[in-house]
Amino acid sequence: KRLRRNKQLCAWLLADDRPQIVYAREVDFSHQQHLYGLFANRRAALQMLQSLADEQRLCYGLLGLEPLSRGRACFRSALGRCAGACCGKESVEAHKERLLAQMSRLQLVCWPWAGPVALEERGPDMTQYHVIHNWLWLGAVDSLNEAAALTRLPAGFDQDGYKILCKPLLSGDYPLHPLG
């Protein structure tokens, strides 16, 4: 079955003061630091951040989800739904720490190798090498010599490949052979 390609695939980038949505077509998700979550579209990313803000009493204004007037508390603060980072009841640093603590479980792992790797899968009767580069499965071969020929990389980020391959590649349960 062919894996889906999503032209609207996005994630949250938390590099500056305010989270921002970035798209896989514009940013290399396999190498960009400080990316959180994989979302099918902007609406899904915004819904997740709003839910997180509601659960953790984070300020919509500081998150960029609604406009914030300078020197005035947000409307949610008056309702007790915001801890008050917008008006000084909570420090902006404490707000950022709470946001990062919650977002950390969604953090994307950057591709940790310099180039492609071959994941060795050994069975009783055969050995196969799965060639992977930037979280993209390029194919399976019977020898490391053949694996070197499979290093051509198509453009884009494959969210299915990332979700499927991240755990086995990082677990240490399988021998890995750098190819590049």
PLM-predicted stretches and their roles:
Residues K1-G180:
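Conserved catalytic/ligand-binding micro-motifs in nucleotide and anionic cofactor chemistry
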